[in-house]
Amino acid sequence: MKVKTNNRRDFLKKTVVAGTAASVPYFFSSQKTLASETRAKNDRIPIGLIGAGGMGVGNMVAAKEYVDVVAIADVDKDRCESSNKKLSGGKADIYSDYQEILERDDIKILHIATPDHWHTKPLIEAMLAGKDVYCEKPLTLTIDEGKLIRKVQKETGRIVQVGTQQRSTFNLFAKAVAMVADGRVGKIKRVQCAIGGGPRSPEIPVADVPENLDWDRWLGPAPKVDYRHIPNANKKGRGKSNCHYEFRWWYEYSGGKLTDWGAHHVDIANWALKVNGQTEGPISIGGRAEHPVEYENGYAVQNDRYNTATKFNFVVKYPGAVEMVIRDDTDNGILIEGDKGRIFVNRRRLAGKPVEDLADNPLDKSAIQKVYKGLPMEHNARKQHWANFLHCHREQIEPISDVHSHMEMLNICHLAGISARFGRELKWDNANEQIVGDDQANAFLARPYREGYEIEMRQTANS
């Protein structure tokens, strides 16, 4: 990873504002909600949106009662214009270069909803420009990018919420974690994450770049390649490409299902392990994976179709004979297995004998809020995750999906991807974040940044 350094000292110093979350009853009846804060202070928050695709627009709609979208940046002109109409009635300023938003003093918070390979660079530069950020998951394309993000966050003190909104689903995922914390499954021995397999594609031919798209800037830090697209047989939908949405299925821009859905379910699994006392990180990861193309030395031998894993089963081993399984088959969800019982949770249900036992032995009313860092709880998952971020922005306190816990779990997803590409088990030094005895695999902890798209670092004011 290439980092460019200069001597500009124009970012805001770290600000620490004392504040504690209000004590609130069980579930959604917060005494101090973000909505009431907004009404009382009469100061809706101006926000800049970087990446105007489906997630970015959807999240802004979810947060519309709290924020005003005043600036939008995207390399796709059509997306800029359509999102501007939907989110601000055409009143927001639109840019092709997100750096112009970073330079605006009237914007204190940002939402980054770009493709995965474009998360790290604007996030770091936003923190250094003094902005608090809600960034979509997965936060990084590599493990080393996560090291840099954590370093900059500590130095700047900026508030960063990661878009793993399952943490804010109180009646399912957060409740499952609260049950684990309350000892309802005993000591965890194994946790299984079923995230579904990845898609295949036919050969996707080189195509003309759409006039509305700046393809070079869309690629950004990634290697320069041709734009590819093939329409669906029925001529409906977006077709298949190496661009919008479909970027998920190319290792050059994402990690496939391992970092797409893995960033959700592995996050909850890791959260459960932490509240269960599993303080030590993983020591190895290995298993099997199938790809739609052949691989040599960790790289796909074909560049004209999807290349991320379609089927997989990985076992992550921890000290104390604890395991995490990441698999493509079975029902999508998380199975938490302890020595006293087991529970299954996904976005539709929470089940298991310990769940049934809640009828006669319910959780304490404060149980869920304890695992939710004592923060206010008020909305459905998507709105609540935004409410949490904006509350933490106002109070300058750590949000529920902070960069440090996120990278703990995302490292697991990245290691699974590296193991898949080489087809072998990896030994992991968690303290130093290095693969042990495998220089070839270790090289995949980072990625080169294309010239002109390096991360702009700014020295801290006290350096």
Language-model regions: role of each:
Residues 115-116, 120-168, 183:
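Beta-strand-loop-alpha-helix segment that lines the small-molecule cofactor/substrate pocket
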Residues 51, 184-202, 214-216, 220-228, ...:
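NAD(P)-dependent dehydrogenases' Rossmann-like dinucleotide-binding region
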Residues 109-111:
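N-terminal Rossmann-like NAD(P) cofactor-binding module of classical short-chain dehydrogenase/reductase
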Residues 14-23, 27, 34-35, 236, ...:
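C-terminal helical cap and adjacent loop that interface with cofactors, partners, or active-site loops
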